């Protein structure tokens, strides 16, 4: 019984990598919708339909739990999928849940009124679609008061990373950080609201300065998943992993191997 990790492209591999290191005995299935990537420039309805199709495919492949390791999909599709009803014995969770738990210092199921939190000025770096959805701001507002969030849509960064052009990606990150700092000169914390961005975490940190706490998703999601699985020992397996893609399997395998710096072999979905 594998845990499913879904992303529109390769960014979710940062979440998978952290989860495998944290949970070496859990089986994982990674599903990349590479033929439709990137999601960040698509409209909300398109993102929902693509995500809905992929998640149902993963459930059919035996994944009782699917993590949307794509902030754009989480922002546009997660709540709608959950409200529409999930088949018995299946679950779908969003990747930004652990981020908001960490930022607000409260569990997702805590339904007490919003309260003051330590961090007051937060920079959010995400894809254009995630920024447009205002999902981070909405979920934060349910749990915290007095938090000022300044969002920066980071156009081009995902494309550069997917193409392996890290020089361009670094230049774009610096440009987007500069644009954010013109709007919010002194953020206390920064959310890397895309699973591709941990690969550029050092660039974000350097551009923001040492006094800004950077929240990156891989470790937080892995810790949250470990806590979830403590209550579900039946999901412990042999530590195997499978990789499927809607794109060109050979090309995606090559990119993924570069991405994680270890051999990754995808099969066609």
Curated annotation (Swiss-Prot):
Enzyme active site: 70 (proton donor/acceptor), 194 (proton donor/acceptor)
Family, similarity comment: Belongs to the aspartate/glutamate racemases family.
Enzyme Commission code: 5.1.1.3
Organism whose genome encodes this protein: Ruegeria sp. (strain TM1040) (Silicibacter sp.)
Protein name: Glutamate racemase
InterPro entries xrefs: Asp/Glu/hydantoin_racemase, Asp/Glu_race, Asp/Glu_racemase_AS_1, Glu_race
Catalytic EC class: isomerase
Binding-site positions, substrate: 7-8, 39-40, 71-72, 195-196
Organism lineage string: Bacteria, Pseudomonadati, Pseudomonadota, Alphaproteobacteria, Rhodobacterales
Pfam families associated with the record: Asp_Glu_race
Cited function: Provides the (R)-glutamate required for cell wall biosynthesis.
Gene Ontology BP terms: cell wall organization; peptidoglycan biosynthetic process; regulation of cell shape
Single GO molecular function: glutamate racemase activity
Pathway where this protein functions: Cell wall biogenesis; peptidoglycan biosynthesis
Domain of life: Bacteria
Reaction catalysis annotation: L-glutamate = D-glutamate
Alphabetic keyword roster: Cell shape, Cell wall biogenesis/degradation, Isomerase, Peptidoglycan synthesis
């Amino acid at each position: 019984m594998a845990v499913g990790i879904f992303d529109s492209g390769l960014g979710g591999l940062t979440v998978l990598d952290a989860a495998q290191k944290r949970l070496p005995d859990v089986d994982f299935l990674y599903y990349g919708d590479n033929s439709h990537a990137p999601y960040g420039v698509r409209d909300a309805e398109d993102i929902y339909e693509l995500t809905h199709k992929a998640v149902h495919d993963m459930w059919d492949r035996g994944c009782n739990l699917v993590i949307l390791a794509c902030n754009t999909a989480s922002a546009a599709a997660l709540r709608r999928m959950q409200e529409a009803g999930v088949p018995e014995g299946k679950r779908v969770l969003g990747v930004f849940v652990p981020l908001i738990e960490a930022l607000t210092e409260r569990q997702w199921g805590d339904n007490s009124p919003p309260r003051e939190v330590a961090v007051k000025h937060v920079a959010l770096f995400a894809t254009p679609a995630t920024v447009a959805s205002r999902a981070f701001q909405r979920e934060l507002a349910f749990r915290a008061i007095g938090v000022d969030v300044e969002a920066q849509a980071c156009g081009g960064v995902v494309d550069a990373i997917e193409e392996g052009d890290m020089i361009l990606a670094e230049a774009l990150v610096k440009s987007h950080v500069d644009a954010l700092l013109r709007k919010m000169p002194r953020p206390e914390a920064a959310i890397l609201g895309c699973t591709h961005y941990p690969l550029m975490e050092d660039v974000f940190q350097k551009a923001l300065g040492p006094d800004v706490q950077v929240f990156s998703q891989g470790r937080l999601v892995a810790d949250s998943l470990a806590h979830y699985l403590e209550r579900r020992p039946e999901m412990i397996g042999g530590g195997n992993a499978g990789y499927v893609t809607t794109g060109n399997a050979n090309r995606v395998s090559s990119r993924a191997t570069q991405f994680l710096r270890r051999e990754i072999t995808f099969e066609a979905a």
